[in-house]
Amino acid sequence: MSLQLGVIGTGAIGQDHIRRCSQTLQGCRVVAVTDIDPQQAARVLAGLTLEAEVYPDGHALIQAPEVQALLVTSWGPSHEEFVLAAIAAGKPVFCEKPLAVTAAGCRRIVEAEIAQGRRLVQVGFMRPYDAGYQALKAVVDSGRIGEPLMLHCAHRNPRVGENYKTDMAITDTLIHELDVLRWLLADDYVSVQVLFPRKTGKAHAQLRDPQIVLLETARGTRIDVEIFVNCQYGYDIQCEVVGESGIARLPEPPQVQLRSAASLSSAILMDWKERFIAAYDVELQAFVDGVRAGRVGGPSAWDGLAAAVAADACIEAQQSGAIVPISLPQRPALYA
């Protein structure tokens, strides 16, 4: 029997997930939606020729008896409220990032889930579901390159809008690396420093771009991440793990190699959706399959908290220029 989903928020990512659950994934169907603009929700359903109930608000949808599990894809500051309500109702919930806009909010969610005594929350960090990252982790975990000593990473976007501010390089961009690199190494961060190279002339006046984030883990691995959101040439994600006896590199997305006019070339993607579209499919299918099997896996509320704590330290490091410690409380048994 199909898992009956309710979706809170029908903006761009909400629409994409509704389409995905209705047309691509197996074992689920969207039976209820809500949005701050009910007419927007109705338009999304009509555009997908989908029959589902439009509820006046997220709380009404969460309490709806036909809704068995939730997708929270609304405005970021509303996530904590709806995730806590879903936990209180005992319903599994997939929450797009951020889990909450503050580390304190993430802690409240962790505490509520612990009080329930079981995992109900999966956070929408999709990179661990990317085939390239999974292959890279398999090499790291196998020991073929020895212990990881250093990571060299980059997160580059062709350009960003005028509303993109310096701290968003952490909260909107680096947040993906903060999650996936911790997963890749199975290691927590202990400190961070942020450096600002010469500013690109392509950035608007209020944005300092590029940035270099230097992280250290509990086991002593050093990580440098270049954040360059006005690189012009494409959407480019790089990750190289330097081990004791070898180097492992994240594979490039498969593209046709072209030999023509005395040159050898292959295309670079321009959009993050193209780069990770398969990972989005896999992560949501994993959520659906897990709930149907009576469990929730994937990135947890604890992982959401870890990313938020690290992000707060990164922003402090942006502002101070100092090396800032990153301190997580002891991991609760629920997330062991």
UniProtKB/Swiss-Prot annotation:
SUPFAM superfamilies: Glyceraldehyde-3-phosphate dehydrogenase-like, C-terminal domain, NAD(P)-binding Rossmann-fold domains. One of its GO terms (biological process) is inositol catabolic process. Keywords: NAD, Oxidoreductase. Homotetramer. Belongs to the Gfo/Idh/MocA family. Involved in the oxidation of myo-inositol (MI) to 2-keto-myo-inositol (2KMI or 2-inosose). This is Inositol 2-dehydrogenase. The gene is iolG.
